Amino acid sequence: MIAIIDYGMGNIRSVEQALKYIGTEYIITDDKKEILRSDGVILPGVGTFPKAMGVLEEKDLVCVLKEVGSLGKPLLGICLGMQLLFEKSEELQNCNGLNLLPGVIRKLKVPYKIPHMGWNELKKEGEISLWNGVEDGSFVYYVHSYYADCPNEIVYGASEYGVKVPGFVAKGNIFGAQFHPEKSGEIGMRMLKNFKGVVEAWKSSQLSI
């Protein structure tokens, strides 16, 4: 069972439809107990970083998401949800994030239209299980004005938009997609299926303990 975090700032329905499409069990929730009972977590997000962190704090979900990280449970952040996984953001004001990944969220300062919106090529920068069946140079769908300034060792896929944009990051059980896999056609569905596989493997490992 995958828990989709519902905190009022996520692209919940499109993520829900994607999980239905790949045939996985899910629950949409902001309940701490249900989140901790799940086998994997998806944190979507649309909006501003400070407001999102404020809502997560109000709902007492910051500590829950940090506990998910410490338990080794697979956690996937999408778009703003990915950005929230980092140490802090410069959006509107300096604001602390979940600190599950090293790095800072910075504003795109490029001679192109902002937000970065539409399809862009995603180049692999390392091998990871979520790449299974995904070709290097596949096109994925972005909508964002900020990007992650983070260590290269956690970047597994990147796009160019006047600056290197980390499109997919990972460290241990923590995964993040700056693009929207749920809006990226069959490539996105493949990556979500691979995340489902990671979740199922984690569940099996817990049952064998």
Swiss-Prot record:
The active site is at 79 (nucleophile), 180, 182. Residues 1-205 form the Glutamine amidotransferase type-1 domain. NCBIfam families: IMP_synth_hisH. It catalyses: 5-[(5-phospho-1-deoxy-D-ribulos-1-ylimino)methylamino]-1-(5-phospho-beta-D-ribosyl)imidazole-4-carboxamide + L-glutamine = D-erythro-1-(imidazol-4-yl)glycerol 3-phosphate + 5-amino-1-(5-phospho-beta-D-ribosyl)imidazole-4-carboxamide + L-glutamate + H(+); L-glutamine + H2O = L-glutamate + NH4(+). Its main location: cytoplasm. GO terms for molecular function: glutaminase activity; imidazoleglycerol-phosphate synthase activity; lyase activity. IGPS catalyzes the conversion of PRFAR and glutamine to IGP, AICAR and glutamate. The HisH subunit catalyzes the hydrolysis of glutamine to glutamate and ammonia as part of the synthesis of IGP and AICAR. The resulting ammonia molecule is channeled to the active site of HisF. This is Imidazole glycerol phosphate synthase subunit HisH. It is found in: Cytoplasm. Disulfide bonds: none annotated. It holds the Pfam family GATase. Keywords: Amino-acid biosynthesis, Cytoplasm, Glutamine amidotransferase, Histidine biosynthesis, Hydrolase, Lyase. Pathway: Amino-acid biosynthesis; L-histidine biosynthesis; L-histidine from 5-phospho-alpha-D-ribose 1-diphosphate: step 5/9. One of its GO terms (biological process) is L-histidine biosynthetic process. GO terms for cellular component: cytoplasm. Heterodimer of HisH and HisF. Its EC number is 4.3.2.10, 3.5.1.2. It comes from the Bacteria.
